């Protein structure tokens, strides 16, 4: 309905709406579980307008307020996303935004006690992959995962003006992960924006969607 009211005829893909631990499932499409107070709900959705796709993710607290643990994880993801967007500059290569998210998420998980060990070793061994198991983004255009190489002659492709990509880091703590404190289990958070590369710097085309915890709580309190 919201897509149609805004002038779009079709969704760009099947929406992902994962409440509670279902937010830890990357492509959860059943979208049928009851939302419960105290849970988060992860919404990954976008419409197709004039043959171009959008792909946006936000994570909301079901009852309008983040718990302390949810906010702590959310803020790590947001810090990683903002830094990755800053890395979406002409002349940087495709992997730089992703590597930025890896470094910040690893440091954040260490600070929260979810990961333990030496920071450099954890990054090198990919220990973060238990909680962040996907790339930071993909090309976006007339298809959600649009065509285009990520490497050319085995070298990461350099970002150029006019390119559009998603930036979507996340942290997903399985409810079955008994290596972490129970207070963290079942938290799944992703924040995704659509970014246009321009000579003067990245443009966030989905910037109107609130994404700080303060703005999200204010939005929900206003409904």
Write out the residue ranges for each language-model feature.
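Active-site neighborhoods and metal-handling regions in enzymes and metal-associated proteins
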Residues: 1-223
